[in-house]
Design a protein with these regions (language model features):
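Charged helix-capping and loop-helix junction motifs
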Residues: 1-4
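Glycine-rich phosphate/pyrophosphate-binding loops
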Residues: 7-33
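Electrostatically charged, flexible surface regions
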Residues: 32-155
């Protein structure tokens, strides 16, 4: 959600910073602990607002789900990746008698990469991650160029 919105802003040439609050999936929606974001928000944002940002880049900030006094500091991190394993489809009938389908992703234990945002959050830090919009996988360019080099036309 927040990173998607920041991507749209960056594509439009707007300085883009995504602010996200981490929270436990259990009891989701009951109470989200915004203490860390409230106490640390200005400290995190000031340097980001004062610095120059390269075109087509954005910043992703994640606040841990802990009390503000327990935050250990701020880490500049790499982007981490969750492995959600296999999805499942849950079928049900709504109160009006219509069928519905939920597609669920089941989080599995993760081992966050070193210097990743996931590691920082797990360790009690606020993560600040610079992201870029050029998603080109440079290492594959030569391989793909070689695979298509012999083709001269559509025929």
């Amino acid at each position: 959600g927040t990173v998607s919105a920041a991507i749209e802003g960056a594509l439009a040439g707007v300085r883009a910073i995504a602010l996200s609050q981490v929270y436990a999936r259990e009891g989701m929606g009951d109470s989200v602990p915004f203490e860390a974001a409230e106490a640390w928000g200005a400290k995190v944002l000031r340097p980001l607002l004062d610095m120059d940002m390269a075109p087509r880049t954005l910043i992703n900030v994640n606040f841990p789900a802990i009390p503000a006094a327990e935050v250990k500091g701020i880490r500049v991190t790499r982007q981490g990746f969750h492995d959600y394993g296999r999805g499942s489809i849950v079928e049900g009938i709504d109160p009006r008698g219509y069928p519905y389908f939920w597609f669920g992703l089941h989080g599995i234990e993760h081992s966050p990469g070193h210097d990743s945002d996931l590691e920082a959050i797990d360790d009690g830090y606020i993560s600040v991650t610079p992201l870029q919009l050029d998603l080109t996988h440079d290492a594959s360019l030569a391989t793909l160029r070689g695979a298509y080099a012999a083709m001269k036309s559509a025929g």
